[in-house]
Amino acid sequence: MRALMKGALACLLAACGEGDAEVSCGPASGRVAEVLDGDTVVLESGERVRYLLADAPERTGAGGDCFGPEAHAFNRGLVEGRRVTLTYGEACEDRFGRLLAYVSVEEREVNTLLVERGHACVLHVPPAGRSRRAEFQALEAQARLARRGVWGACAPVPCQR
């Protein structure tokens, strides 16, 4: 009876997770076909993916934003043509229909790298990213204090307008 109960508990934990249920919104991985800007990519499968909690300066438009080309180049150097892993948060898509995900390449999470190196600011649009918001805000505060990226190059900082 005890073995049966342990087995049932193991199955329940496997099925339900241990309180850290991940949302499955799209593919778990894919190859990046195109880097649109500092915080958005297109996979070979056609899905557009917006990085959760990272808001990079725009590189297009009326002259683009300060540090937009640098953020785009940094992102391209990390992910273009490479296989990435996608982890989803509390929401699957933004209002433009893009998948919202934490994107990793070779065990490095691109979202956190962008914020900690000053290539992006934190953007929290509830509920997406709620569980990791404080972590990203701490990374942004460190980048701001060290005047990395946008924090040293731009006045005003594009994502602070």
What are these model-derived regions, one by one?
Residues 2, 6, 12-161:
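Small beta-barrel nucleic-acid-binding modules, primarily SNase/OB-fold domains
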